[in-house]
């Protein structure tokens, strides 16, 4: 009876947690396997390295899963993967179509992170889903598109003409070592964008949620749209003309010297430095500092 009571309690807990499968062997000892039971392959602790083929035509990367990825731009193409020797066959790579796809086949468990190192002459785009880290160095003047979904940490360095970044989730991007002439950035969620040094045309920034964004440098045009409780600290970015609006409790700090259009709806605030020559301001919480 005592064993039956325990099994019943476990069954209730499993059903509360989610779908449960009841397995009753011949000895009568019920086993409960929930939908969250892991079938992941355990790493054997024996770290190995593999060289894999990649062509010079690859100029993009698509990452799915938890791994540490490094992309180096500007040298002869190469691809190296590292991890527990029994997990490397599950770390899949496909370089067809000009984009390197990286993913794990099924679940894995290991104390040694899976590592991928890619070297390519050019990198035009990167997409990453899930957790882990992505580091890109040596960007060399072309346009670059970045798409992030999840909690991944990303570092970007080099020089680009146009930078287009979209972040969904709680991840973070540090581009303080990146120089760009024009940037378009969108953040949905609680993540963080450090947009680096802009020098030239424009910054377009959209924040939805509780995320944060920063930028430095100098641009001709600044456009900011903020919805929610987020924060855009752009006081380190000089702009000639600025168009800023907030909806919610978030805040924007910016700098403009030419024409300013600013509107605040809700409890959020806008603070603009630089004494802009032309001003069109609406909302009680818009402040222009001389």
Model-derived features with residue positions:
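Intrinsically disordered, low-complexity terminal regions
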Residues: 1-290
């Amino acid at each position: 009876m005592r064993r039956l009571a325990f099994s019943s309690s476990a069954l209730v807990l499993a059903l509360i947690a989610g779908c449960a499968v009841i397995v009753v062997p011949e000895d009568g000892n019920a086993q409960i396997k929930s939908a969250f039971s892991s079938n992941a392959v355990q790493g054997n602790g024996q770290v190995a390295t593999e060289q894999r083929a990649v062509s010079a035509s690859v100029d993009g990367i698509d990452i799915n899963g938890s791994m540490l990825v490094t992309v180096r731009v500007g040298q002869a193409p190469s691809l190296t993967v590292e991890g527990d020797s029994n997990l490397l066959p599950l770390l899949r790579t496909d370089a067809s179509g000009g984009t390197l796809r990286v993913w794990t086949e099924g679940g894995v468990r290991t104390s040694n992170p899976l590592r991928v190192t890619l070297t390519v002459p050019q990198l035009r785009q990167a997409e990453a889903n899930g957790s882990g880290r992505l580091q890109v160095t040596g960007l060399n003047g072309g346009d670059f598109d970045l798409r992030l979904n999840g909690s991944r940490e990303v570092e970007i360095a080099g020089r680009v003409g146009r930078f287009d970044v979209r972040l969904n989730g709680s991840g973070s991007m540090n581009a303080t070592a990146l120089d760009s002439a024009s940037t378009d950035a969108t953040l949905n969620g609680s993540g963080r964008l450090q947009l680096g040094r802009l020098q030239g045309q424009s910054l377009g920034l959209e924040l939805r949620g509780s995320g944060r964004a920063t930028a430095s440098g100098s641009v001709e045009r600044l456009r900011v749209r903020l919805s929610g409780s987020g924060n855009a600290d752009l006081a380190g970015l000089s702009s000639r003309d600025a168009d800023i609006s907030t909806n919610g409790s978030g805040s924007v700090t910016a700098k403009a010297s030419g024409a300013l259009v600013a509107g605040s709806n809700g409890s959020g605030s806008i603070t603009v430095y630089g004494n802009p020559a032309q001003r069109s301001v609406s909302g009680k919480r818009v402040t222009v500092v001389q």
